[in-house]
């Protein structure tokens, strides 16, 4: 455990950011899974789920939670499944 005040604050900040990042990444993964399953089952709301998943993937890449190339691969697989 750090003794210096700024180091203590930094640990707290890092912990908070880590929780936020994990939460946002999990939301993105869930959205992608729901979109894939909706596209496979030809659900009525597949367009909404697809756009929501693409939005989540773009935001994750923008926030550097995932690499830009990974975001492109995910979006490509979703769009291919949508055809």
Curated annotation (Swiss-Prot):
Domain of life: Bacteria
GO BP annotations listed: translation
Leader sequence segment: none
Keywords associated with the record: Ribonucleoprotein, Ribosomal protein, RNA-binding, rRNA-binding
Gene3D superfamilies from the UniProt entry: Ribosomal protein S20
Pfam family, one: Ribosomal_S20p
Record's keyword annotation contains Protein biosynthesis: no
Region (Disordered): 1-25
SUPFAM superfamilies: Ribosomal protein S20
GO molecular function terms listed in the Swiss-Prot or TrEMBL record: small ribosomal subunit rRNA binding; structural constituent of ribosome
Protein name as annotated: Small ribosomal subunit protein bS20
Protein species of origin: Staphylococcus saprophyticus subsp. saprophyticus (strain ATCC 15305 / DSM 20229 / NCIMB 8711 / NCTC 7292 / S-41)
């Amino acid at each position: 455990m750090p003794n210096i005040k700024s180091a203590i604050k930094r640990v707290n900040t890092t912990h908070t950011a880590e929780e936020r990042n994990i939460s946002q990444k999990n939301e993105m993964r869930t959205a992608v899974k729901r979109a894939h399953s909706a596209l496979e089952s030809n659900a009525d709301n597949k367009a909404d789920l697809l756009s929501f998943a693409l939005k989540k993937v773009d935001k994750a890449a923008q926030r550097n939670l995932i690499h830009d190339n990974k975001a492109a691969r995910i979006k490509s697989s979703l769009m291919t499944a949508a055809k």
